Design a protein with these regions (language model features):
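Feature activates predominantly on carbohydrate-active enzymes
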Residues: 1-201, 205-218, 265
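Active-site neighborhood of glycoside hydrolase catalytic domains
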Residues: 165-175, 180-292
Length: 292
């Protein structure tokens, strides 16, 4: 017989994966024959994870993965005892999550009209490309992952990497556009205008729907690769900088501190709703927030 002592249900899941690894590879097939006569050596295995966070990052903005493809990835993660999927749901190249308060995010922002071929900056295909997930589909995926012992952490990348959102709602940018969902890789100069209260209203409304879908403790807010070129010339952003008393110093420019203000404000909002933020390392620009 096989005995599995474990402190948690996930411990049992991981133990079962270990046992399966002792068996022939056919154990991972879609069907098993009743004639199989497998055995495992008599042994004791003491196993425990080295790291509490064992994750994978999945970017569905540049390349859209179908629901079945995402589930297959989750299945493979479970085999390898990974417990966290960092799901990158938005970027310049596409917005992939339904937000009911802002339907144009998927009506407009989920489709790009062209895509750069490889790294040839002047060479594009001419095929519209995109897709998105409904909120019901995402809730189903959260449950599917949880049944495998996997937590999904959603990422809404901001205030940069927001061309798909700006194409949908141009008033959220510093210049008013026109903008388009990006068909290029790399970094765009146009970002959310954080001098406007309307922008923070947008961010908070989006995050309210995100936390209603995803029960994870952490929400990833990006924070990376946010050029400050537009903020430097934007009257609304400069007015907020003046109002907050932000100034250039030996550690950074006032616009860097404006991003820090933005991060702190979003962090406070999510903390009030029982969540914590994660971001890319460039979120450090302008100083680290309290609980990030």
């Amino acid at each position: 017989k096989i005995e599995i002592p474990a402190a948690t249900p996930n411990g049992v899941r991981y133990a079962l994966q270990t046992i399966k690894q002792l068996l022939p590879v056919a154990i991972y097939g879609e069907t098993l024959s009743a004639d199989e006569n497998w055995s495992v050596p008599c042994t004791t295995i003491n196993d425990a994870p080295r790291f509490g966070y064992r994750g994978m990052h999945l970017d569905v903005a540049r390349h859209f993965f179908t629901l079945d493809e995402v589930k297959r990835i989750l299945n493979v993660m479970a085999v390898h005892k990974l417990n966290t999927l960092h799901w990158h749901l938005t970027d310049d190249q596409g917005w992939r999550v339904e937000i009911k308060k802002y339907p144009r995010l998927t009506e407009v922002g989920s489709i790009r009209n062209k895509t750069m071929i490889r790294k040839e900056w002047d060479n594009y295909d001419t095929t519209p490309y995109g897709g998105f997930y409904t909120q019901d589909e995402l809730r189903d995926m959260v449950k599917y992952a949880a049944d495998l012992g996997i937590t999904i952490i959603p990422e809404i990348d901001l205030p940069g990497h927001m061309m798909a959102a700006l194409a949908s709602y141009p008033e959220l940018g510093c210049t008013g556009g026109p903008y388009e969902v990006s068909g290029q890789w790399g970094i765009r100069d146009d970002v959310l205008c954080v001098g406007k209260e309307k922008t923070f209203e947008f961010i908070e409304n989006v995050l309210l729907e995100i936390i209603d879908i995803f029960p994870s403790k952490y929400i990833h807010i990006g924070g990376d690769e946010c050029p400050k070129i537009r903020w430097e010339k934007c009257p609304a952003c400069q007015a907020r900088i003046q109002k907050l008393g932000l100034k250039d110093d030996e550690h950074g420019k006032a616009e860097h501190y404006l991003q820090s203000y933005t991060t702190e404000r979003i962090e406070k909002f999510l903390n009030e709703h029982g969540r914590e933020i994660i971001g890319w390392d460039e979120m450090l620009e302008g100083g680290l927030t309290t609980n990030a």
